[in-house]
């Protein structure tokens, strides 16, 4: 049966997150759904996978509940194993901003739809896209002319301000995967004196679905085993914009350095994986440390890698 992945969020005041967590876990288990759901007093943020029928039942159940009506669900084709298990947790925030203390229900940027943004590109309107994703996410796909956040974690958002000061009186559009981070990121810019701040409604995924290979190049990074999602990738207009860290050839295949104390997330082509092990290592030192490590000895006790 065809699998489907749902990406969704909602900022809404939840009085008893633990109760909602338990309800979410029970609902997902009853529908054989796997994925990650975060519940907090500020709302819910989730990505789940199941059959098309079961994910649609999940949406129906959410609409009938107390808190989660009128959520915009971003749907994409699953592979049946996007997630190894179900994780439903209560956390202080659904997107960790820590000390920034931004409440999107009180302050956030104006919404711009995928259609409006596409029109702006076509009409060559003056505007500036700021990609609020982590730095490793946009190396596989990005909007034309975008300004990178340059951050490794969303809670480092303050580091974005110095590179954007010249845009305080310009039209700025914040973008992210599904929209949840831009709710806070756009609000953060507003409270810091930016005068014309927008956020891409429903995120990059929705734009790519409606306008594949038009002003967004490459593939979209996602936080599950698929790692990247593309739309109409057989179209001659589709570009592979990622580059192998080692040889700089076009690639959009993400790997982790195999060494336990590194695990750097990066892009590598198949030709540049270690010939002896088939794994990715950042450098000779990482491989040597991995060979000596206890984890390697437990996993491959009979092999002596040089």
Give the residues covered by each predicted segment:
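Substrate-contacting helices/loops that form the catalytic groove of nucleic-acid
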Residues: 177
